[in-house]
Amino acid sequence: MSELRLMAVHAHPDDESSKGAATTARYAAEGARVMVVTLTGGERGDILNPAMDLPEVHGRIAEVRRDEMAKAAEILGVEHHWLGFVDSGLPEGDPLPPLPDGCFALVPLEEPVKRLVRVIREFRPHVMTTYDENGGYPHPDHIRCHQVSVAAYEAAADHLLYPDAGEPWAVQKLYYNHGFLRQRMQLLQEEFAKNGQEGPFAKWLEHWDPDNDVFANRVTTRVHCAEYFHQRDDALRAHATQIDPKGDFFHAPIEWQQRLWPTEEFELARARVPVTLPEDDLFKGVEP
């Protein structure tokens, strides 16, 4: 098999469209096989689009989100696999309430690791992407996604582990997504000001020390994917329960984004092949 294969592991449907989506669309368009693995069904996600906040949607939210995910995958040109766990929800309050019984974040780690190992050994990706140890933000399912992904990356290559889950496969590189960068937000906010408009990012920037962008300091790899930003946004809009089309995400014109920040960012977390940093290609150094 000489084709390149990329696996993007995400916690919920819609995460694949808000984190690294233009990169996955680019590689799929260039002929790589790309698979998105979604660990939960997003059953406990809030409805964030007022137009979809309807009783008939609430009553069948799991089915609706599956349909949304199928549309987004088609738009991005990727394959898709559900790992089959139940959304934990985002606990709120002080003190935080306990997580619901049976949710993904409370399932013993070995269960999702074994399922993901099986998918890895079947798809045989050269590269995987997932979240950092903080989950990108501290949602319990995102943190668990990190733990599961890293454990499965290691276990899939070990013939002693999960021998009934297929022939061992060593993924060559593992990356963390890093899409929430202060400098990008600052550039876009300044562009609004230059055009006599009030940008939507002031509320974020005022509490964010410009000298302490911990995410930017971790970036090793910047993938040029500006021509796929339209696909990214179309895929995100496909998740109509989760995305308000009038929300902040869509305020900055695509043309500004393409000119000011034409890349998506990643952190190389683990590699089994020689690497030279910084990079501009997730497949750099990979042996097909």
Curated annotation (Swiss-Prot):
Disruption phenotype: Loss of amidase activity on MSmB, no production of the mercapturic acid product AcCys-mB. Limited degradation of MS-RifSV, a rifamycin S MSH conjugate. Increased sensitivity to streptomycin, slight increase in sensitivity to rifamycin but no other antibiotics tested. Increased sensitivity to iodoacetamide, N-ethylmalemide (NEM) and redox cycling (oxidant) agents known to conjugate with MSH such as menadione and plumbagin, but not other oxidants. InterPro entries: GlcNAc_PI_deacetylase-related, LmbE-like_dom_sf, Mca. Zn(2+) binds at H12, D15, H142. It comes from the Bacteria. Pfam families: PIG-L. Its cofactor is Zn(2+). SUPFAM superfamilies: LmbE-like. It catalyses: mycothiol S-conjugate + H2O = an N-acetyl-L-cysteine-S-conjugate + 1D-myo-inositol 2-amino-2-deoxy-alpha-D-glucopyranoside. Disulfide bonds: none annotated. It is an enzyme of class 3 (hydrolase). GO terms for molecular function: hydrolase activity, acting on carbon-nitrogen (but not peptide) bonds, in linear amides; zinc ion binding. Its EC number is 3.5.1.115. Transmembrane segments: none annotated. One of its GO terms (biological process) is mycothiol metabolic process. Keywords: Hydrolase, Metal-binding, Zinc. Binds 1 zinc ion per subunit. Optimum pH is 7-9. The keyword Zinc applies. NCBIfam families: mycothiol_Mca. A mycothiol (MSH, N-acetyl-cysteinyl-glucosaminyl-inositol) S-conjugate amidase, it recycles conjugated MSH to the N-acetyl cysteine conjugate and the MSH precursor. Involved in MSH-dependent detoxification of a number of alkylating agents and antibiotics. Activity is specific for the mycothiol moiety. This is Mycothiol S-conjugate amidase.
